[in-house]
Amino acid sequence: MREGDSNSKKSADVAVLSIILTGSTLTLIYTYKRYLTQFKRTNDIPRRIFRKHWLYGKVTSVGDGDNFHFFHMPGGIRGGWGWLRPVPQMIKNGSTAEKLVGDSRNMRFFNFNWITHGRSTKSKIQKAKSQFLKLNVPYKNRKNLPTIPIRLCGIDAPERAHFGNPAQPFGNEALIWLQNRILGKKVWVKPLSIDQYNRCVARVSYWDWFGGWKDLSLEMLKDGLAVVYEGKVNTEFDDREDKYRYYEFLARSRKKGLWIQNKFETPGEYKKRI
């Protein structure tokens, strides 16, 4: 083979190799940006994700009965989380929820009516509360992390004490239940919209070893710790409104959780009143 032909072949090989390397690099960049980029705040989530895709991550903080903070971990272990990319470590609580919000359990009912029915109702309410207050909250909330605030779709949990306003009955119990169920655990989140507080309204799914995949909003309704969302703005059900209303009806008919009360003010009514 002549020297000129040999040089031409080498040049062609180099060109092909360069094209392959360039193509591979561009593919890797595209794959990373599309599938492995971490969303660190609500506004980072692309519009193409809403209503169509699920995000995987860890719950690092639960501050209320129907919302929490979500640390996005795209790709999971295959995306490098836990061996190439650090995952926030939770701090063990070392305390039960009963100690953390003992004020809820020890709440005094100032009722001077000694009629047996009244005393029986009060006892039933305390008993209903106690089953939630005894739940273990294994971790403390982690703050100051790049997380997305998530608002559970389709439901409203009883309000806790805010800005000097009193808490609703079962407000603390709903918080404890949610902390027990998801704090420090991995969940899947399906973004649906963004509300007026810049929270991502989403359907949330988590794995239960005894029952498989669970819809978090639905589980709260089943246990009587939330009602179907009543608002007219940012109303999101992800095509599950009928199912949510059915299980709310079951919880109400069985007097589970907050439905044990004879007189009940919904979270929506409470917010309008104050």
Curated annotation (Swiss-Prot):
Similarity comment text for this entry: Belongs to the LCL3 family.
| Protein name per Swiss-Prot or TrEMBL | Probable endonuclease LCL3
Q: Membrane-crossing residues?
A: 15-32
Give one GO molecular function term: metal ion binding
Top EC category:
hydrolase
InterPro entries associated with the record: SNase_OB-fold_sf, Staphylococal_nuclease_OB-fold
Ordered alphabetically, the record's keywords are: Calcium, Endonuclease, Hydrolase, Membrane, Metal-binding, Mitochondrion, Nuclease, Transmembrane, Transmembrane helix
Please indicate if the UniProt record lists Hydrolase as a keyword. Answer: yes
What SUPFAM superfamilies does this protein map onto? Staphylococcal nuclease (SSF50199)
Q: Where does it reside?
A: Mitochondrion; Membrane
Which PROSITE patterns would you find in this protein's record? TNASE_3
Which EC numbers characterise this protein's activity in its record? Answer: 3.1.-.-
Gene name of the record: LCL3
> Which part of the chain is the TNase-like domain?
53-261
Predominant subcellular localization, coarse grouping = mitochondrion
Q: Where is the active site?
A: 151, 159, 199
Q: What does the record say about its membrane topology?
A: Single-pass membrane protein
So where does Ca(2+) get bound?
156
Q: Name one GO cellular component term.
A: mitochondrion
